[in-house]
Amino acid sequence: VENRRRFLAEAAGSSAATLVTLRQIHSGMIRVVEADDLERPGGLQTADGRAMLRGDGLMTDVPGVMLGVQTADCVPVLVADVKRRAVAAFHAGWRGTLKRIVERGIGMMRLRYGSRPEDLLAAVGPAIGPCCYSVGEEVRYEFESQFAYADELFSEVYDSDPVRDKYPLLFLTARAPGHSNIGPQIHLDLWEANRRQLLDAGIPAKRVTVVGECTACAVYGDRKKYFSHRGESGFTGRMMSVVGVANRFA
């Protein structure tokens, strides 16, 4: 609890700000936070401080509310309407990206708050990059069925083995009958996939910032810079990305 107060004081300039988070479920579900939600006993948290809302997107126009999404490889996307004072936060793994959670979220902001894409600022935060994010063929198939530009999101990466590269015939004959050669890994660019959704929603490219740092391999000095579920084999923490509406008189 004390750590959360310090975080709010740093991010919002006031520990009195209200932080709203989600029980993230890798969905396309987006929840709207209204002033009435915060007036209920306990607000949007359980007695032990856990998030009550399930989903992977949040939006609000309530002053003093901070929206947070937690990631450790998935993509955090933050959006702010600087004219209508509304914000949104999205947690986009490959499933949420496939469900167009970011693109749909911008549409919801337009309907609910009257947001215009040209007034929005968006940030695609640190996430696992195309350098490290290998996926199965079934994921590529799913994206190809949904996005006309899917080919631009995938690359094929071959492992380099000096011995195998020098003596390829040795490795061919060593494989059991019926087994093919070692094929390439398929890598997915979630940064670009979510940037494209922001552009498709009408936000000008110059108003979209992509941090472009990979959570699995970025370093700071001699240490890993970010938590990474894949880079740390599932034993890791979580980062929180936050956006909110400032209290005019704070």
Question: Where are the predicted features?
Answer:
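Active-site microenvironment for binding and transforming phosphate-containing groups
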Residues: 1-250
